[in-house]
Design a protein with these regions (language model features):
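Residue patterns forming the tRNA-binding/recognition surfaces of aminoacyl-tRNA synthetases
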Residues: 2-20, 26, 30-34, 108-246, ...
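N-terminal catalytic cores of NTP/NDP-binding nucleotidyl/phosphoryl-transfer enzymes
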Residues: 43-106, 157, 237-244, 319-348, ...
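Secondary-structure capping and boundary motifs in well-ordered enzyme cores
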Residues: 46, 50-57, 67-71, 75, ...
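Acidic, turn-prone loop/beta-hairpin segments
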Residues: 97, 190, 197-202, 537, ...
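Residues immediately within or flanking Cys/His clusters that coordinate Zn2+
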Residues: 186, 412, 483, 526, ...
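Short cysteine-rich clusters marking metal-coordination/redox-active sites
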Residues: 189, 415, 486, 529-532, ...
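Cys/His-coordinated zinc-binding microdomains
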Residues: 193, 474, 490, 533, ...
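Protease-associated
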Residues: 250, 257-334, 343-347
C-alpha cells in the first residue's frame, strides 16, 4: 500500500518563491483600488481613536530617489503602519520641497538659456513644470516601495495655501520685530550669484595658500620694545585667503592672551605675536634666529592701537580690536580682520560701532560674480577672487610685507548645488534676529524628546551658538520677501496690513502674483507710506531661503491646514519629525526657529534621526567610485520587501552599510521568514478556528511552550516598535522563525501533523497553536514586509471573518495566560538537553554513523537535575529528539569513550544505528511494527490511525 496518501502533508497555494518584483505591484493596485489609506482613517475616526501625526520632511523635487530617500521613507512608513495597527488614527501627508536654487539651476542648465534673457515669470513657469515632473516620478517610486499616505493630497511648497501661510509666518515675525534688513558678511556663491545659509554649505578638502603678513606699526601707544625705532615694528597676521587682504581694516587680538615682541635677529625686525603661537609661526616662516624682547603684554593693552595696511598705496590705518573669536588653534594670535569677508570680522567691528568707538564703511571690493572691483586696485580689478590670490601675494612680497608662505589642505565651504567654493561677502540682506527669541528656542529644544538622545545637545548647541539667519536669496524661483519700498523716502515697508493683503492674493493666485502685479495692486487700497505718507511703491526682488519655506510647513499643514487635510492633518505640535542627522542644522532647525518665533513652542514633540547610507566597507556612495546601490535596482531584482527588511535590520541611528552582498544576504533571511509562513499556512488547510480550536488548558505542553515563545516575541516586537528600535524587532522575528519555530517547534511537530488523524486532539492542538502564531506573526511583521504580510493575510483560512487587509487589522493583543513561568523554566532545561543531542546527531551524521536521525537509537547519560528532567519526559523523549529510540542512564561513567559530551561534561550522548524495523508510514523504527495484521509494515500507532480513517 502507498501510505504517503494517508499522510496529512502540507497544502497551500502560497508559493515558495516570492516573485516580489512582479507580485508587489498587484498589492499596490489593490490598496489603491480599495482606498486603503482613507479606509484606515475612516475606521479610526469612527472609533474616536487618538491621533498620531508624523510630519513629512519634504524631499527636494529634483532627480530620482536614492537609497537615502528609501531609508527615510521606509522608516516613516514602518512607524505610520505600526501606529495605525496599535490603535491610532495615524496620518501621513507626504510633501515636497519645490523652490530654490537647485531647481532654478537645473532649469537654466537644461534649457541652455541665460537667466538675464528670461523674464522672471517665464523662468518660474519652467521651474514649476520641472518640479511637478519630478514630484510625479518620485511619488511613483515611493508608492512602489510600499509607502502608504495621502498622495492624492500631498503638500508642495509651491502650493498657494502653503505660500500664503509662509508669508503669514514672515509677517508675524516682522510684527514682533524679528525681521530686519542690513549689511552683513554672509556665505556667497559667486557662480549662483546668491547668498547661502549654513544649511546650504558642504565642506570639501581644498588646497589654499597660507601666508604670514607684516603690518607696519603706526601708533602703538608706547607698547614697543624700549629704544627700538618704530620702523622696525610689525604686527604679523596669518591668513589662507590672500584675496581678502585688500579688504583688511583691522587686526583682532584676544584681550586675555599674552603677547610678546619677537626679535628676528637676522632681519633686525620685531614682530607682535601671541607667546604660545610664536614658535610654530616662526617655524612656518623659516625664522630660526630669534629672541623675545621687551615685556609680556595682554591683548587688552593693544585695543585701538594703530598699524598700517601692508600695501603702502592704500594709506589705510588698521586698528587693533578685541575679539573673543581669536583662539590658539593656529596663526599668530593677531587675526586678519576684514568685516566685508568674515562673520566674526563683521561682528567684532559692529560691536565697536555700536559702542561708538569706531565708525567706518565696511570694505567689500568683490562683486556678485566674485570678481575684484576697482576698490581693490587696478592690478586686481576684474580678476576672480581665486585669480587674485597670486597677484596679492606677489604684491605683498614686492612691498617686503610677506613674512612666510606655504600651502595648506583644509576643509573649505562649497555651494551645495554648483559645488564651487564660496566666499564670505558683506551685502544687504534680510535677516531673522535670533537673539530676540534664542532663550525660548533653547527651552523648546529642552522640551523635545530626541531619538537618539544626543540629538538634543547637537541642536541645542547649534541654536545657542548661531548667528542671525540670512533669509533672503537673490533668485527668482521661490516665495518673495513680502516687503515694499517707498519711492518717496526709500524706506522699506512691512506692516500687518500689507502682509494681510499679500497673503490674501497669494492664497488665490500663488506667488506669481508678486511679479505679475504692480505694487499698488498688491497693497491695501489707498495705502500710504507710514514713514513719509508717500503712495508710490515697488516690490522687493529677493526671495526667501528654501529653509524658510520648508521650515514654515508646520503652519500650512499642521496648525492651519488646507481644508482637504483638516480632519487628518491638523495636529500642532505634531508627534514626530524624522529625518537624517544632517537636518539638525536644516529642517529641524529652521522649523524650530519659525515655530518658536511665532508661537513660542517647537512644532514637534519628538525628533528622530537616522544616519547616512554607506557602501559595504563604510565608504560614502559615489557614482565615480561605482559603489552606489540604487533602491530601484534592489526592488527590480529582489522586491521592495527585501529592501524594507534590510532597513528594519540595521541600527539606523548611526550610519548604515549596504552592498549587493548585503542585499543578497537579506534576501536569504527573507526567504526563511517566507518559508515559515508557507509552512504554517500549509498545515492549516483543513483547520477552522471556530470549530477546531483546542482550549489552552487542553493543549499539548509543546504547543503551550510555542505560545509562550510567541507571547515573549510579541512583547519584544511591540516594545521595539514603540521605541523605534526596528532592528530589535527584526532580530526577534528572525530568531523566532529560524530557531524557535523551524529548528525546534515545527521540526518536532511534523510527525504529529502528518501522521495523526486529521481531527485528533494531538493534531488540532498543534493547529490551534500554529493558527495563533500565524495570525499574530503576520501582523507583527506587517509594518515592515508589508507586501508579503498582505499575501499571507489573503491566504489565511476564514478570510471573510477578518479585515479585508492586514493593514486594516490591529496588532495582536497581549495574553498574560501564555506567560507560564513554570513552563518556561521547564522547557529551558529540556531544550538545553535537546541541543546536546542535536549536536551529537550532527556529528554522527558527519561521521556517517547514521543517515537520517530516525535511523538512530540514542542513550543519554546524566545525573542530578538533568536526569530528573529526562525522566519527566521519558515517554516523549524520542519524539522530542527526532530519533526512533531514546534511553536514559543515570550513570555518567557508563558512557562509552566515543560518546558526545556537553561543554561542561554533565551530559553525554551515545548514538547507535537502530536495528528495529522501520514503519513505512512514519519512518520510525519501533518494536511494534507489523503488530496489526491488517496493516503490514507499519507501527501500532499508525495502524490505529489507519483503522480510524477506514483504511
Amino acid at each position: 500500500m502507498d501510505y504517503s496518501k494517508t499522510l496529512r502533508l502540507p497544502q497551500t497555494e502560497f508559493p515558495m518563491r516570492g516573485n516580489l518584483p512582479q507580485k508587489e505591484p498587484q498589492f499596490v493596485e489593490l490598496w489603491q483600488d480599495k482606498d486603503l489609506y482613507n479606509k484606515r482613517i475612516e475606521k479610526r475616526k469612527k472609533e474616536g481613536a487618538p491621533r498620531f501625526v508624523l510630519h513629512d520632511g519634504p524631499p527636494y523635487a529634483n532627480g530620482k530617489i536614492h537609497i537615502g530617500h528609501a531609508l527615510n521613507k521606509t522608516l516613516k512608513d514602518i512607524i505610520v503602519r505600526y501606529k495605525y495597527m496599535a490603535g491610532y488614527m495615524a496620518n501621513y501627508i507626504p510633501g515636497w520641497d519645490t523652490h530654490g536654487l537647485p531647481i532654478e539651476y537645473a532649469v537654466l542648465k537644461d534649457s541652455g538659456e541665460d537667466r538675464a534673457n528670461m523674464s522672471v515669470l517665464e523662468l518660474r513657469r519652467k521651474c514649476l513644470e520641472y518640479a511637478k515632473k519630478w514630484i510625479e516620478i518620485q511619488k511613483t517610486d515611493f508608492i512602489r516601495m510600499g509607502v502608504i499616505g495621502d498622495f492624492d493630497n500631498r503638500y508642495v511648497t509651491f502650493d498657494p495655501h502653503l505660500e500664503a501661510k509662509e508669508i503669514e509666518v514672515f509677517g508675524e515675525m516682522a510684527r514682533k520685530g524679528y525681521i530686519y534688513k542690513g549689511k552683513k558678511a554672509v556665505y556667497w556663491c559667486s557662480h549662483c550669484e546668491t547668498a547661502l545659509a549654513e544649511a546650504e554649505i558642504e565642506y570639501k578638502d581644498r588646497k589654499s595658500p597660507s601666508i604670514y603678513v607684516k603690518f607696519p606699526a603706526k601708533n602703538i601707544k608706547g607698547l614697543g620694545p624700549e629704544g627700538v625705532d618704530q620702523s622696525k615694528l610689525f604686527a604679523v597676521i596669518w591668513t589662507t585667503t590672500p584675496w581678502t587682504i585688500p579688504a583688511n581694516q583691522y587686526i583682532s587680538v584676544n584681550p586675555k592672551f599674552t603677547y610678546v615682541w619677537v626679535h628676528n635677529l637676522d632681519a633686525d625686525e620685531y614682530y607682535l605675536m601671541n607667546k604660545e603661537l610664536a614658535p610654530a609661526a616662526l617655524a612656518d616662516c623659516k625664522i630660526e634666529n630669534y629672541e623675545f624682547a621687551g615685556r609680556e603684554m595682554t591683548g587688552a593693552e593693544w585695543e585701538l592701537a594703530e598699524f598700517m595696511h601692508p600695501w603702502a598705496s592704500y594709506n589705510r590705518t588698521v586698528y587693533v580690536l578685541e575679539g573673543n573669536h581669536v583662539t590658539l588653534d593656529a596663526g599668530t594670535g593677531c587675526v586678519h580682520t576684514a568685516p566685508g569677508h568674515g562673520v566674526d570680522d563683521f561682528e567684532v567691528y559692529k560691536k565697536y560701532e555700536n559702542e561708538g568707538k569706531l565708525k567706518q564703511e565696511v570694505i567689500c571690493p568683490v562683486d556678485n560674480k566674485g570678481r575684484m572691483t576697482a576698490e581693490a586696485g587696478s592690478f586686481l580689478e576684474g580678476k576672480t577672487v581665486w585669480e587674485a590670490e597670486g597677484p596679492s601675494i606677489s604684491a605683498l612680497a614686492h612691498e617686503g610685507m610677506l613674512l612666510g608662505k606655504k600651502s595648506l589642505h583644509h576643509q573649505y565651504a562649497h555651494c551645495w548645488r554648483c559645488k564651487n567654493p564660496v566666499i564670505y561677502r558683506a551685502t544687504e540682506q534680510w535677516f531673522a534676529s535670533i537673539n530676540d527669541f534664542r532663550e525660548d528656542a533653547l527651552k523648546a529644544v529642552d522640551a523635545t524628546r530626541f531619538i537618539p538622545s544626543w540629538g538634543h545637545d547637537r541642536l541645542y548647541n547649534m541654536i545657542r551658538d548661531r548667528q542671525d539667519w540670512c533669509i533672503s536669496r537673490q533668485r527668482s524661483w521661490g516665495v518673495p520677501i513680502p516687503a515694499f519700498y517707498c519711492d518717496g523716502c526709500g524706506s522699506y515697508v512691512i506692516t500687518p496690513e500689507t502682509i494681510a493683503s499679500v497673503k490674501e492674493i497669494v492664497e488665490k493666485e500663488g506667488t506669481d502674483a508678486w511679479w505679475a502685479h504692480p505694487a499698488e495692486e498688491l497693497l491695501p487700497k489707498d495705502f500710504k507710506c507710514p514713514h513719509c505718507g508717500g503712495s508710490r511703491f515697488h516690490q522687493e526682488k529677493d526671495i526667501m531661503d528654501v529653509w524658510f519655506d520648508s521650515g514654515s510647513t508646520w503652519n500650512g499643514v499642521l496648525k492651519d491646514p488646507h481644508p482637504v487635510w483638516k480632519d487628518t492633518g491638523a495636529a500642532y505640535p505634531c508627534d514626530l519629525y524624522l529625518e537624517g542627522s544632517d537636518q539638525h542644522r536644516g529642517w529641524f532647525h529652521s522649523s524650530l526657529l519659525t515655530s518658536v518665533a511665532v508661537n513660542g513652542c517647537a512644532p514637534y514633540k519628538a525628533v528622530l534621526t537616522h544616519g547616512f547610507t554607506m557602501d559595504g566597507e563604510g565608504r560614502k556612495m559615489s557614482k565615480s567610485v561605482g559603489n552606489v546601490v540604487a533602491p530601484q535596482d534592489i526592488i527590480d531584482k529582489y522586491g521592495a520587501d527585501v529592501m524594507r527588511l534590510w532597513i528594519s535590520s540595521v541600527d539606523y541611528q548611526g550610519d548604515v552599510r549596504l552592498s549587493d552582498k548585503i542585499v543578497k544576504s537579506m534576501s536569504d533571511v527573507y526567504r526563511k521568514i517566507r518559508n515559515t509562513f508557507r509552512y504554517l499556512l500549509g498545515n492549516l488547510y483543513d483547520f477552522d478556528p471556530k470549530t477546531d480550536s483546542v482550549a489552552y488548558g487542553d493543549m499539548e505542553e509543546l504547543d503551550r511552550w510555542a505560545l509562550l515563545r510567541l507571547e515573549q516575541v510579541k512583547r519584544t516586537v511591540l516594545k521595539a516598535y514603540e521605541d523605534y528600535e526596528f532592528h530589535v524587532m527584526y532580530h526577534a522575528v528572525h530568531n523566532f522563525c529560524t530557531v524557535d519555530l523551524s529548528s525546534i517547534y515545527l521540526d518536532i511537530l511534523k510527525d504529529r501533523l502528518y501522521t495523526e488523524k486529521d481531527d485528533s486532539l494531538l493534531r488540532r492542538s498543534a493547529q490551534t497553536a500554529m493558527y495563533e502564531i500565524l495570525t499574530s506573526l503576520v501582523r507583527l511583521v506587517a509594518p515592515v514586509i508589508c507586501f508579503t504580510a498582505e499575501e499571507v493575510w489573503q491566504a489565511l483560512p476564514n478570510r471573510e471573518e477578518r479585515e479585508w487587509s492586514v493593514h486594516m487589522a490591529d496588532m495582536p493583543a497581549e495574553n498574560d495566560r501564555y506567560l507560564d513561568k513554570a513552563l518556561e523554566e521547564k522547557w529551558k532545561k529540556r531544550l538545553a538537553l535537546r541541543s546536546v543531542v542535536t549536536k551529537a546527531l550532527e556529528e554522527a551524521r558527519r561521521a556517517k554513523v547514521i543517515g537520517h536521525p530516525l535511523d538512530a537509537e540514542i542513550t543519554i547519560y546524566a545525573d542530578g537535575e538533568h536526569l530528573e528532567t529526562l525522566k519527566a519526559m521519558e515517554k516523549e523523549l524520542a519524539d522530542f529528539c527526532l530519533v526512533s529510540q531514546a534511553k536514559i542512564s543515570g550513570d555518567l561513567s557508563a558512557a562509552p569513550e566515543n560518546a558526545f559530551a556537553s561543554e561542561d561534561g554533565t551530559v553525554k550522548v551515545s548514538i547507535a544505528v537502530c536495528t528495529l524495523e522501520k514503519c513505512e508510514r512514519c519512518w520510525k523504527r519501533t518494536p511494534d511494527v507489523n503488530s496489526d495484521p491488517k496493516h503490514e509494515h507499519v507501527c501500532a500507532r499508525c495502524a490505529k490511525v489507519l483503522t480510524e480513517m477506514g483504511e
